A protein has these predicted regions:
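Preference for intrinsically disordered or flexible, low-complexity segments
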Residues: 1-147
Length: 147
C-alpha cells in the first residue's frame, strides 16, 4: 500500500493508523516510510520496557519494526539499554528445547507466581509467551499475556 512497488513479501500484522491498511512492504517498514506516510505505528510507545535512555532508539520498534500479534496489548522488551529482537511465540516446551527456560526466569520482572506460569505455559494456549533476545549480550527475555 505505501510505495506502490511490486513485492511478493508483505506485512499484514498490527499497524496502528487512522486508515485501514491492507498490507505494507518490508522496505517501507524498515526505512520508516510506511509509518510516515500513514502517520502510524507498529507498537504503542507506552508498551515498552523502561531503561532505554536514547529517544532515537524508540523509533525502531514503533516506526520501523514489524509488530507481533498478542492476546492483549503487545509489549516490547529491552535489555542493555536497547530494545530487543522479537524471536517468536513460545511455551515452556520451546523454552526448554532452546535451553533458555532458566535464563528467562532470571528476570526481575517476574515474581514466583509468574515464573510458575511461564514454567507451565503452552505455546498457543491461554497463556502465551513471546520470546525476545538482547541485541548486545544475547540474553533471552519473555513477555506473556492471557486470552
Amino acid at each position: 500500500d505505501s510505495c506502490g512497488k511490486t513485492t511478493h513479501i508483505f506485512y499484514t500484522a498490527p499497524f496502528y493508523a487512522f486508515e485501514d491498511i491492507a498490507y505494507l512492504c518490508p522496505e517501507c517498514i524498515a526505512n520508516g516510510e510506511a509509518a510516515r506516510i500513514y502517520d502510524g505505528s507498529f507498537q504503542d510507545d507506552f508498551s515498552v520496557d523502561d531503561g532505554v535512555d536514547d529517544p532515537e532508539k524508540l523509533d525502531e520498534p514503533i516506526h520501523r519494526t514489524p509488530g507481533y500479534s498478542g492476546w492483549q496489548q503487545e509489549y516490547w522488551r529491552a535489555h542493555c539499554g536497547d530494545y530487543c529482537a522479537y524471536l517468536g511465540r513460545v511455551g515452556a516446551r520451546e523454552l526448554r528445547a532452546l535451553g533458555v527456560l532458566v535464563e528467562v526466569l532470571d528476570d526481575p520482572m517476574w515474581d514466583e507466581e509468574q515464573k510458575d506460569m511461564i514454567r507451565e505455559s503452552v505455546n498457543g494456549g491461554h497463556l502465551q509467551c513471546y520470546l525476545f533476545q538482547c541485541l548486545h549480550c544475547g540474553k533471552h527475555l519473555v513477555w506473556m499475556d492471557f486470552d
